[in-house]
């Protein structure tokens, strides 16, 4: 990372903490950090004294800006940009009469028009709810007469297109399911509507929640920070839409990192909950051993607020019984700016070393945690687990998709495929034709063949991994945390910057599927930006049902660093201010 950028980030992060800035400058000078930042200094004619001067100057500038930030903040305390406003801010505006749900929906629809249908054409939105404005008017009147149902009353939410909605198609991004209208809402969608949330849109995704970040229904999705970059998958449409402020809240699904990859790639916050905390009813399955819906938003506060609305025991999903007496209905109560003060954090260095700038940002994040009082220690996963985790995941994932997708297909119209074999047959026919209103996806459709040939749930290999491998992974990760009394293990959510849309760059060995193999929760918070202005996120992996603690830690980190920024491709539109 270029030295001025890194120094500015640190200066801004610690601008209101003079002692921490001084301490950090001395620490980095002692470590000769300018030598790492200017490795070619002698060739470029930059002396070490010049580098040191730049380092000090940029840090002092950051400190100056931080010290005067309270004055600026006081002047603008009553006005926020749309993307800056949390649910709490919006409810304050609702209560003061300066904002209505109808107006909020209009603001988001204008942004979708400007940046998804026109402009950079992010291609994140598949379907808009044509009743959204009318629903907003009804909810405004209800608020006036009887008050709000919940903090989500009148708040627009956008859903990944593999989550059932009875009033909009659910295709999982696939032409194989084009036009499918489910018989009812998914359990979590019903919970959202009952809380007064407005389902604004259905979002593009990696087809059938796997493969490249495109779908045969919607095509490729673009990253609002750089449209030549991928928003990652499979919840890429949700990640791009929330970063670009097409809705206040988004829902993705995560089987092997599909909430967390798009969260970090688009510079937002998100959560892969503990397996069983949220119902999977009405979600197109990929592998039920791993599948989990996850809230995504620009702010940790909003992620916490949305999660509490969706929890609860669902008789149609046996996994939710694990959350009995362990789920909360209000996670915002655990948001604590001082939560890092007594925390013990493990850094999984197994996932560093693949992108120097990502590593720099993670190291700066660790310093931020230490400055807030946290103790940070190194942890390492057993090498054998790192070696086998991919095979375990694929073995279970492919076989479960083959066995479980027919159960979902049985709930939709007779005109749709009813088995994986029928899906393969129809995909082959579509590829031989020129479909209207879609784009063939041979990469994902060829994977259907591999899934069909993968085996059954009776295979000894599957049984061994499911019944013995997964519990072993759980014991190992819990043991790592117990051995050092850790509150969370952190790591770069993606060890490299987002890949190009055409597939170049990105990749690397990721830790994300460890949270799926174990079923443990994983909270992602923005950590910074690379020199080419691409987002980097940091993951907080915790024990089962430790979401309250993770929210405290993540919120404290977010408030201490405040590195989130609006994507350059989707700037604010005129009149988007929220007046509280």
Region locations from a protein language model:
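Bacterial N-terminal signal peptides
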Residues: 57-70
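Short helix-loop capping/hinge segments that flank enzyme active sites or metal/cofactor-binding pockets
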Residues: 153-172, 334-348, 398-473, 478, ...
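Bacterial N-terminal signal peptides that target proteins for export
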Residues: 46-59
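Glycine-rich, small-residue loops and helix-cap segments
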Residues: 97, 154, 194, 246, ...
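Structural helix-boundary/capping segments
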Residues: 114, 244-349, 363-372, 407-411, ...
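Short glycine/serine-rich loop/turn segments
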Residues: 152-293, 318-322, 346-348, 489-508
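Short, Lys/Arg-enriched N-terminal segments with co-localized hydrophobic residues
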Residues: 31-47
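Short, well-ordered alpha-helical
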Residues: 75-171, 175-178, 208-210, 322-323, ...
């Amino acid at each position: 990372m270029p030295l001025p950028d890194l120094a500015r980030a640190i200066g801004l992060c610690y601008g209101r903490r003079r002692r921490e800035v001084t301490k950090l400058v001395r620490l980095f000078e002692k470590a000769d950090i300018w030598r790492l930042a200017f490795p070619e200094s002698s060739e470029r004619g930059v002396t070490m004294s010049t580098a040191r001067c730049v380092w000090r100057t940029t840090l002092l500038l950051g400190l100056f800006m931080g010290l005067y930030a309270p004055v600026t903040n006081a002047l603008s305390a009553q006005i926020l940009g749309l993307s800056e406003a949390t649910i709490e801010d919006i409810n304050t505006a609702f209560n003061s009469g300066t904002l209505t749900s109808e107006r909020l929906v209009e603001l988001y629809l204008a942004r979708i028009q400007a940046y998804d249908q026109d402009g950079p054409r992010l291609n994140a939105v598949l379907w808009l709810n044509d009743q959204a404005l009318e629903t907003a008017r009804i909810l405004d009147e209800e608020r006036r007469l009887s008050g709000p149902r919940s903090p989500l009353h009148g708040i627009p939410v956008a859903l990944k297109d593999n989550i059932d909605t009875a009033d909009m198609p659910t295709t999982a991004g696939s032409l194989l399911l084009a036009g499918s209208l489910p018989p009812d809402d998914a359990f979590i969608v019903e919970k959202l509507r009952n809380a007064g949330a407005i389902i604004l849109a259905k979002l593009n995704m990696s087809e059938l929640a796997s493969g490249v970040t495109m779908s045969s229904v919607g095509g490729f999705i673009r990253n609002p920070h750089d449209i030549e970059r991928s928003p990652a998958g499979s919840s890429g449409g949700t990640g791009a839409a929330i970063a670009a402020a097409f809705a206040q809240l988004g829902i993705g699904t995560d089987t092997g990192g599909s909430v967390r990859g798009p969260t970090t790639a688009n510079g937002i916050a998100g959560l892969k909950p503990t397996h069983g905390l949220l119902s999977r009813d009405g979600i197109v399955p990929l592998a039920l051993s791993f599948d989990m819906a996850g809230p995504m938003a620009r702010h940790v506060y909003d992620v916490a607020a949305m999660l509490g609305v969706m929890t609860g025991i669902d008789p149609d999903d046996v996994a939710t019984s694990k959350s009995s007496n362990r789920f909360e209905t209000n996670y915002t109560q655990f948001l604590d700016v001082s939560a890092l003060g007594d925390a013990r954090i493990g850094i999984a260095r197994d996932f560093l070393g693949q992108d120097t700038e990502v590593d720099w940002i993670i190291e700066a994040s660790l310093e931020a945690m230490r400055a807030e009082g946290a103790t940070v220690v190194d942890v390492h996963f057993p090498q054998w687990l790192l070696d086998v985790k991919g095979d375990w995941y694929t073995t279970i994932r492919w076989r479960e998709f083959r066995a479980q997708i027919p159960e979902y297909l049985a709930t939709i119209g007779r005109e749709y495929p009813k088995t994986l074999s029928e899906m393969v047959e129809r995909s082959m026919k579509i590829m031989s034709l020129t479909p209207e209103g879609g784009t063939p996806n041979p990469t994902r459709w060829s994977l259907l063949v591999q899934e069909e040939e993968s085996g059954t749930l009776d295979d000894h290999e599957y049984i061994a991994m499911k019944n013995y491998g997964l519990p072993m992974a759980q014991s190992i990760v819990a043991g790592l945390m117990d051995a050092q009394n850790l509150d969370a293990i952190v790591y770069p959510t993606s060890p490299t910057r987002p890949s190009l849309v055409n597939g170049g760059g990105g990749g690397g060995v990721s830790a994300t599927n460890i949270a799926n193999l174990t079923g443990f929760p994983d909270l992602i918070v923005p950590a910074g930006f690379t020199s080419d202005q691409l987002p980097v996120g940091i993951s907080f992996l915790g024990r089962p049902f430790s979401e309250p603690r993770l929210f405290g830690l993540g919120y404290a980190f977010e408030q201490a660093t405040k590195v989130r920024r609006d994507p350059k491709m989707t700037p604010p539109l005129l009149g988007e201010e929220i007046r509280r």
